[in-house]
Regions:
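Nucleotide-activated chemistry modules centered on ATP-dependent adenylation/adenylyltransferase
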Residues: 1-38, 42-200
């Protein structure tokens, strides 16, 4: 079976737009969102949805939220972007990860974490009347873009809101996120949020 090119699908969808749809963009952190927002802001009215109960400990969550806000305040592509920050809800993540604490990054715990965060994003997109929802997670070379897109497409069906396919790491998206992080002085963490053993 031919592998899908999610980046090409997103480009084609954007090219077909005749208006500016509303997009709820799940963001894991400022650095990852930087290249995604730069690419999407010319075409969508965007609110960033910072829902990341997996980020442990709480001090790390606060730090990443601070740098997400900093990016939106400093970058020209962030000036018209809104920010929605639900409660951190660490309990929801610990329940989703129960029994999977020893899994390596990329394993079953990651899948459950994707489902948790994207489910909440899809719910918020439906409740808020957004046209699309998406995530910055596919900018990372460590994240499984086909899996993330499959989860997003299933949730789109379940919640009646459109999923924006993506593979933001393509077309040097990850490299661009590093460049923008340096440009705006962003804190770049070395792990996704939950992967350190002491967090469990």
């Amino acid at each position: 079976m031919q592998q899908r090119n999610y980046q090409r699908e997103m480009d084609a969808l954007i090219a077909s737009l005749d208006a500016r749809p509303r997009l709820l963009l799940h963001s894991c952190c400022g650095p990852c969102s930087s290249a995604c927002l730069e690419r999407l802001a010319p075409h969508f009215d965007i609110d960033v949805f910072f829902y990341n109960p997996n980020i442990l400990p709480a001090e790390e969550w606060e730090k990443r939220l601070f740098w997400q806000k900093h990016l939106l305040e400093m970058a020209p592509f962030g000036k018209d972007v809104g920010l929605i920050v639900p409660e951190r809800d660490e309990t929801a993540f610990r329940l989703a990860a129960a029994g999977l604490e020893a899994e390596a990054e990329g394993g079953a715990r990651c899948t459950e974490c994707f489902v948790l965060r994207l489910s909440r994003t899809a719910e918020a997109a439906r409740e808020g009347g957004y046209d699309y929802f998406a995530t910055t997670l596919t900018v990372s070379p460590h994240k499984n873009a086909p899996l993330i897109n499959a989860i997003g497409e299933k949730l789109a069906e379940d919640h009646g809101v459109l999923w924006l396919p993506s593979d933001f790491k393509k077309r040097d998206g990850y490299r661009r996120s590093i460049e923008l992080s340096h440009e705006y002085g962003l804190y770049r963490q070395s792990w996704c949020g939950c992967g350190l053993p002491e967090n469990f």
